[in-house]
């Protein structure tokens, strides 16, 4: 089954902030790869980010996404570097955006 991608403006903005163009390209390639069998890629997240999945890109970079099986949509919510304990950690950013309601307002469930 082929899925349609919906990428949030927030995610696009986060990708633009990645200074290494090779990593930007790798992120985009991994996102494109989510069109086919996204449920077999990445891992299921827990706690505040339950119902989301994360896929490794290059090094410590991650893409956070959600699958809507009913409408065959992969919602790509955020992308960035994993820096545990840092303010710029992609999971920390995603949690803040989710709490602020910004992720849910940008993409359908």
For the regions a language model picked out, list residue spans one by one.
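Residues that form or immediately flank small-molecule/cofactor binding pockets and catalytic motifs
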Residues: 10, 50, 81
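Enriched for short, Lys/Arg-rich terminal
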Residues: 4, 13, 57, 66-109
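Internal amphipathic alpha-helical segments of the cytochrome P450 catalytic fold
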Residues: 24, 41-42, 73
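Arg/Lys-rich, positively charged N-terminal/basic patches that mediate binding to nucleic acids
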Residues: 1-28, 104-109
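A short, surface-exposed loop/turn module that caps and links secondary-structure elements
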Residues: 32-57
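Histidine-centered metal-chelating micro-motifs
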Residues: 61-63
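Hydrophobic pocket-lining residues within nucleotide cofactor-binding pockets
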Residues: 18, 45, 49, 79
């Amino acid at each position: 089954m082929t899925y349609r991608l919906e990428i949030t403006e927030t995610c696009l903005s986060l990708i633009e902030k990645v200074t290494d163009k090779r990593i930007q390209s790798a992120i985009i390639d991994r996102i494109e790869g989510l069109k086919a069998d996204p449920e077999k890629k990445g891992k299921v997240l827990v706690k505040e980010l339950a119902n989301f999945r994360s896929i490794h890109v290059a090094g410590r970079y991650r893409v956070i996404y959600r699958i809507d099986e009913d409408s065959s949509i992969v919602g790509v919510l955020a992308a960035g570097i994993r820096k545990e304990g840092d303010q710029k950690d992609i999971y920390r950013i995603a949690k803040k955006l989710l709490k602020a309601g910004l992720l849910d307002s940008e993409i359908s469930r």
